[in-house]
Amino acid sequence: MGICPHKYDIIVFMNHIKNYAYTHTPLQFDFKQTVERFFVEEIPLYTFTNTGNYLILKIQKSNMSTWKLITVLAKATGLQERDIGYAGLKDKNATTIQYISIPKQYERELNKNLTTEKVVILERSYNKAPIKIGHLKGNAFSIVLHHINEKDAKFFTTTAKKMQKEGIPNYYGYQRFGEDSRSYLQGKEIAQSGKRLKGSKEKLLVSAYQSYLYNKWLGQRVKLSTIIASNNTLQAAKKLDYPEELVKVLAKQVQFFKLFIGDAVIPYPYGKLSFVKDMHQSSQAFLQKKISPTGLLCGANVERAKSDAYYLEEAYDDTELNTLKGDRRFAWIWPKDVETKYECNGKKLKVEFYLPKGSYATTFLEEIGKFSLKNM
């Protein structure tokens, strides 16, 4: 009961970069990513030991990117930028809190020379090892939306709580693709040149190409799941050009995002990758938030999906991309700790929530609002 979709069938889906999983009417609100309206705090992966050779700094910064912060700290301490540890990149246009590590013997130089008002050290600790990229659980967000009426604010809250329970597609946000949203084209050209990557900029461009292909694949899977959810078995089978028996099995899955044989899944929020062999069993685990399907970030040394699931992945897999390590990314995530507070007089809605590492607050807001936040 396998599938072998025509290449054309898949390419039709590729026209849709962003497909929303939820079907409610779009909401109206004003979003701006500014230091006054966008707050994010990094949640560390582990508790620091408070002993060891590395100074751990909990830093609040505003109107400053992580790259700029590292440059400022390097200048203040005399360290090379590569010797300053961080877990993830934070945007410039926000008020952010993140953790940084430096060798503790440079603490005196830091105290003496760090003078900018844009950087505030909130806490200090020590650890036996430096912070490395990826060493975070996730991020806690607090965002203020403007020009939202009370009715929409209530519906926003209800929808956000529903998404906390049922989950959302884990698209990369528009920030990943540069100001003109076309950085992935440069990345594709670099990736397919076969040349070794030069510097962090080329790596960033190639990773944008990886992310673009992933978003295309995810949009196709969301569209596919929408067709199954919104049509009877016969209609869905015709629209997808799938065997009716397969669609019947897929339609029995309670969750929105349908799993296929061979889908690469990982225990949520972390664990060892495995492949779907029994759709019913995996569907139950998915419903219980025990596992989540993953999408391909094509590159070197990465596991591909298998069987039916790979037919759906193949159109978004660039086997020429070997200059950057590949990976798999959760396709479906569950926001946590969702809270809202509405200010009637100012028509403002304060939204607080937590997302796992690598997930975008703007993606969550776009799924609720049903419109792009880019260039608002």
List the predicted regions and their residue ranges.
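Non-catalytic, substrate/partner-engaging modules appended to enzymatic cores
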Residues: 4-376
